């Protein structure tokens, strides 16, 4: 394996990078699926937790915190409720991981050919991460929307299967229905992935040489720190994306029946601030950060190990 911050940029064949990215996404998604469902439920909840009067006309559950939300889902929907939306999510994560790492590798190789006008390493990582994140997000967005809608279902099922959900959305909402909130997603993921990769590439060479690192290795620790910092900065757009994804004819049928009607990213932000305050933009942030740390650590660790395994296997042939 190569040293320093170049390890993600130039190692492995295209096939190895695609396969390693797909494996990393698959493993990561399955491990953090319960936290993802909890996060989505909290993000879609609009009533105040500190004002009991706002609970008077609420139809559906009232979630308070990560652990209590998890317990409520298990009690009302069974343990499998924590993996709702896992099929479209697994498909999304595999495709996303493969596209993301491939685009990142390709972009950095293109930027490396700009000599003698090559960008500084940190800026190069930022641009590559932004391009990779934007492309992967837009390409897999319909699966992201399906994941959210399945996770938002309570005991009453709106969609009975993945195929049925695709047919229903296509019939009742048209092609645009699969891209509700896509602008918020791209607006969120471009700076997120740019910041994530720039931080990760900067930290990994430093942390990889240290012993007794938390999370098991320098790769994982760098992934955790990079993810937490980037996630906090763009979280309001993530919440807006979730609220927009459940708009349409099924808006009042999810586990939270009182989801307002939102139109557009900026009007959604304004409405949330007006009715719920600035804190309303950060609902679910705690569980999001709890999820982001292991998810990114698992993703980067699995990617690095998968790539090394495939590389060693090829050399041994």
Curated annotation (Swiss-Prot):
Superkingdom to which the source organism belongs: Eukaryota
Main location: mitochondrion
GO MF terms held by the record: transmembrane transporter activity
Subcellular location: Mitochondrion inner membrane
Solcar repeat residue intervals: 12-110, 120-206, 214-309
Transmembrane segments: 17-35, 91-107, 126-146, 181-198, 220-240, 284-301
Keywords, alphabetical: Membrane, Mitochondrion, Mitochondrion inner membrane, Repeat, Transmembrane, Transmembrane helix, Transport
InterPro entries: Mit_carrier, Mitochondrial_Carrier, Mitochondrial_sb/sol_carrier, Mt_carrier_dom_sf
Topology within the bilayer: Multi-pass membrane protein
One cellular component (GO) term of this entry: mitochondrial inner membrane
Family from the record: Belongs to the mitochondrial carrier (TC 2.A.29) family.
Function, as annotated: Mitochondrial transporter that mediates uptake of thiamine pyrophosphate (ThPP) into mitochondria.
Protein name according to UniProt: Mitochondrial thiamine pyrophosphate carrier 1
Annotated source species: Neosartorya fischeri (strain ATCC 1020 / DSM 3700 / CBS 544.65 / FGSC A1164 / JCM 1740 / NRRL 181 / WB 181) (Aspergillus fischerianus)
